[in-house]
Design a protein with these regions (language model features):
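Catalytic and ligand-binding motifs that coordinate phosphates/metal ions
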Residues: 166-168
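Intrinsically disordered, low-complexity regulatory segments
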Residues: 3-164
Length: 168
């Protein structure tokens, strides 16, 4: 699906992961809301090198995924013209991390940016989510980052050993 840029006329920007959800959610929220998709993760560890600062508390060095530059720049433009930006990524550690990365990329304050979650895409569930926002759960973000860092460390260290074993 093509990302079609346009000027945001709505007061609120809601960012979801999946474009399939955006039209239905927009229909439930009405004209004061624009709903756009991030198409999943917008940043990741670099493809070259480890991308983890081991000396600095295993700090991950995230980079914008090349295929997400356009999406992020459009979300940034729309967010800047909205009165409020809402994070509505999936309610799991991946979704929480995606929301946190988006908030950081858009220079939104993670302590005050409304985070909404819903378990079904119904008018009632969406309206309840908007009435009861929370903030990004940094415990879930930390859990996802720990998993991502461990995946990279194990993969980075094991790959050469595995390749040597495969070749012999």
């Amino acid at each position: 699906e093509t990302f079609i840029p346009h000027r945001l006329m709505a007061k609120n920007l809601v960012i979801v992961e999946s474009p399939a959800k955006s039209q239905t959610i927009k229909k439930f929220l009405g004209p004061d809301f624009e709903v756009k998709a991030s198409y999943g993760h917008t940043v990741d560890l670099p493809t070259k090198g480890m991308g983890i600062d081991i000396e600095n508390g295993f700090k991950p060095d995230y980079v914008v995924s090349p295929d997400k530059r356009k999406v992020l720049s459009e979300l940034k433009r729309l967010s800047e013209s909205a009165e409020k930006t809402w994070i509505a990524t999936d309610e799991d550690r991946e979704g929480e991390a995606i929301g946190w990365h988006i908030a950081n990329q858009l220079k939104l304050d993670v302590k005050t940016t409304p985070r909404i979650v819903f378990h079904e895409i119904t008018k009632t569930a969406i309206e309840n989510a908007v009435k009861n926002p929370r903030t990004i759960d940094m415990h879930l973000v930390d859990a996802q980052q720990a998993r991502r860092v461990l995946d990279r460390l194990v993969g980075f260290e094991l790959s050469p050993v595995l390749w040597r074993k495969i070749k012999t």
